[in-house]
Structures are given as structure tokens and as C-alpha cells.
């Protein structure tokens, strides 16, 4: 019996070492060499080097002086990240969207962009379409006492245009740049 068990245990040990130790170390080493920023979480730091967040995870910004991220079904907690799973016919979804739209609505700006009232699939989407960021520019400029053109230029300079897919604005990076502006 041990004769039959020995090759199985040896295979288990070898495969465990290869797949559980060697392969992860190899992939981590290659990632650190080829993509160090991404391998370490795409962290955004302030001037002193303090980590403020990741380019990959949304944060909640309250107050009129900040650009707001998309709503989060999990209150921006990475542990409970998820979509709301509410059906389009669910009255609770309609109520939440109406409440969020009322909070985001800016007079004479037209309808609130969909991205500002709907959650993303993960509930932690860090990006907005440029039109959703531009929609908030007037509110942010007014609250901060800044010229609207300056805030609009800031949105434009933080608009990322990937090779494939729509243009996006990272809300955390935009708010960090906004915090660095002189009032």
C-alpha cells in the first residue's frame, strides 16, 4: 500500500511547491520588474509620500468642493463590494436614483449624467465618464471660489483616453489635483 501511496504523496509535494511557491514567486518577480507601479496596487501618494488611495478603487467624497464618485452599493468598502442587484422594476432602485439625482442636480445643467446615479458592477469603480466630471465642475468651482474655466481645464487634463474603450476620469487623481490648487 505504501508503494502506491508514495508516488501520490511525492506528486502532491512537488506540485504544491511548484504551484504554491515557485510559480507565485516567479510571477511576482516578473510583475515587480515589468510593472512595479501596478504590481504594488497603483497607489496615489501626496507630496510627502503618504498613500492616499489606489487608482483602482473608488473613494467616497462628500461635500460640494469635491468631485463625487459613482454611488457604491457597498458604501465603498472593498470587503462588501458588489452591485446593488436591484431589478430595474424595483421601487427601491427608483427611489435611490431619484435621491442621488436630487443631490447631484445642478440648476441649468440639464439632466444628471447616468454615471452619477447608478452603481457600477463592483460598486468600487474609480472612474467617471468625462461628461459626468464636467457636469460637476460648476458646483466644485463655486464651492471652492475658483474660476469655472480652471476647473474644466483640470477635468480635461485628467481625462484618460485609452487605446480601446471610452475616455474616463479617475476621481481620486482629479480630487488630489484639485486639492493642490490655490484658492
Curated annotation (Swiss-Prot):
Family: Belongs to the KdpC family.
Any one GO cellular component localisation term in the record: plasma membrane
Molecular function terms from GO: ATP binding; P-type potassium transmembrane transporter activity
A matching Pfam family: KdpC
Membrane topology: Single-pass membrane protein
GO biological process, one term: potassium ion transmembrane transport
Transmembrane intervals: 10-30
Lipoprotein found in the keyword field: no
Location relative to the cell: Cell inner membrane
Organism: Pseudomonas aeruginosa (strain ATCC 15692 / DSM 22644 / CIP 104116 / JCM 14847 / LMG 12228 / 1C / PRS 101 / PAO1)
Magnesium found in the keyword field: no
Domain of life assignment: Bacteria
Keywords: ATP-binding, Cell inner membrane, Cell membrane, Ion transport, Membrane, Nucleotide-binding, Potassium, Potassium transport, Transmembrane, Transmembrane helix, Transport
Protein's recorded name: Potassium-transporting ATPase KdpC subunit
Role noted for this protein: Part of the high-affinity ATP-driven potassium transport (or Kdp) system, which catalyzes the hydrolysis of ATP coupled with the electrogenic transport of potassium into the cytoplasm. This subunit acts as a catalytic chaperone that increases the ATP-binding affinity of the ATP-hydrolyzing subunit KdpB by the formation of a transient KdpB/KdpC/ATP ternary complex.
Assembly and interaction partners: The system is composed of three essential subunits: KdpA, KdpB and KdpC.
Lineage, broadest ranks: Bacteria, Pseudomonadati, Pseudomonadota, Gammaproteobacteria, Pseudomonadales
Amino acid at each position: 500500500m505504501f508503494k502506491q501511496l508514495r508516488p501520490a504523496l511525492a506528486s502532491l509535494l512537488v506540485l504544491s511547491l511548484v504551484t504554491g511557491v515557485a510559480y507565485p514567486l516567479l510571477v511576482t518577480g516578473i510583475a515587480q520588474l515589468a510593472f512595479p507601479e501596478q504590481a504594488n496596487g497603483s497607489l496615489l501618494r501626496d507630496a510627502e509620500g503618504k498613500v492616499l488611495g489606489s487608482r483602482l478603487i473608488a473613494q467616497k467624497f462628500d461635500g460640494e468642493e469635491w468631485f463625487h464618485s459613482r454611488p457604491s452599493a457597498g458604501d465603498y468598502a472593498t470587503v462588501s463590494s458588489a452591485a446593488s442587484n436591484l431589478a430595474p422594476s424595483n421601487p427601491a432602485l427608483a427611489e435611490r436614483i431619484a435621491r442621488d439625482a436630487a443631490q447631484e442636480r445642478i440648476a441649468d445643467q440639464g439632466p444628471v449624467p447616468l454615471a452619477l446615479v447608478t452603481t457600477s458592477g463592483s460598486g468600487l469603480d474609480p472612474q467617471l465618464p468625462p461628461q459626468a466630471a464636467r457636469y460637476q465642475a460648476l458646483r466644485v468651482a463655486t464651492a471652492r471660489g475658483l474660476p469655472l474655466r480652471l476647473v474644466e481645464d483640470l477635468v480635461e487634463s485628467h481625462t484618460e483616453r485609452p487605446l480601446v474603450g471610452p475616455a474616463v476620469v479617475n476621481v481620486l487623481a482629479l480630487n488630489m489635483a484639485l486639492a493642490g490648487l490655490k484658492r
